């Protein structure tokens, strides 16, 4: 395995994690907002709609990632003219896997916003849309950013299934190396280098998420 191969794995892992997380938030953020707004104590309570959206989210969360990958192969093949063999062929399955998780994370983050601030906005005549865009999301932004980091780490973990469709990445590379060197893989420096690189990426995501969250968190701590 050459240095260029390792570099390719790193870029595949980072690229796949970033894009899948981005797409999952594009889809999951609106659903998370809807879950929060339409619940019993939300801005616009709607029992049947909240139940329906929640059912979609829960069903997607309950399907194992590997099964979703298999189900999505026809869709991936239709879009990319191939269902397996390249790093981008796992983007759609990873997005679907993370979508439900994102929706629940967003719902939870918005639920942390003080009811008093929402009531104050209502008293000032703000519409529901204005409350969502100018109160709920801005007030929950630190929690939302932390959620992004958590989701990104989970998505990176999902890339372990990339091995099953030849989609590449560090975790897939680690398992491939193991299958080809089952007798001496534990004593191989390369094997541990791949593991260390994976850990560094995970730590980088977590630290970046915490750093940004602290920077944008405007809440005052009372001593």
For each predicted feature, which ranges?
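Transmembrane alpha-helices
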Residues: 128-160
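Membrane-embedded alpha-helices of multi-pass transport/permease systems
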Residues: 26-31, 89-92, 96-118, 148-149, ...
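Transmembrane alpha-helix signature in integral membrane proteins
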Residues: 6-37
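Cytoplasmic-entry segments and transmembrane alpha-helices of multi-pass inner-membrane transporters
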Residues: 34-72, 94, 104-108
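Loop-to-helix entry region at the N-terminal start of transmembrane alpha-helices
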Residues: 8-17, 58-61, 65-101, 190-195
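C-terminal transmembrane helix and the adjacent membrane-cytosol boundary/short C-terminal tail
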Residues: 35-40, 189-223
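Short helix-to-coil transition segments within interhelical loops
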Residues: 110-140, 167
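Non-cytoplasmic
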Residues: 76, 147-181, 189-200
């Amino acid at each position: 395995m050459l240095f260029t191969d390792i570099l390719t794995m790193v870029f595949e892992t980072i690229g796949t994690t970033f894009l899948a997380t981005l797409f999952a938030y594009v889809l999951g953020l609106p659903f998370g907002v809807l879950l929060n707004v339409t619940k019993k104590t939300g801005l616009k309570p709607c029992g049947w709609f909240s139940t329906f959206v929640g059912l979609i989210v829960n069903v997607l969360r309950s399907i194992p990632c590997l099964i979703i990958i298999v189900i999505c192969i026809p869709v991936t093949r239709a879009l990319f003219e191939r269902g397996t063999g390249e790093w981008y062929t796992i983007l759609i399955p990873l997005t679907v896997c993370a979508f439900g998780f994102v929706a629940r994370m967003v719902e939870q983050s918005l639920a942390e916003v003080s009811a008093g601030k929402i009531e104050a906005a209502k008293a000032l005549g703000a519409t529901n849309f204005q409350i969502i865009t100018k109160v709920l999301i801005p007030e929950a932004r630190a929690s939302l950013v932390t959620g992004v980091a958590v989701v990104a780490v989970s998505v990176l973990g999902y890339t372990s299934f990339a091995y099953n469709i030849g989609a590449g990445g560090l975790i897939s590379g680690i398992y491939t190396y193991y299958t080809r060197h089952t007798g001496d893989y534990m004593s191989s420096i390369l094997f541990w280098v791949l593991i260390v690189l994976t850990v560094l990426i995970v730590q980088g995501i977590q630290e970046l998420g915490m750093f940004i969250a602290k920077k944008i968190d405007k809440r005052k701590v009372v001593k």
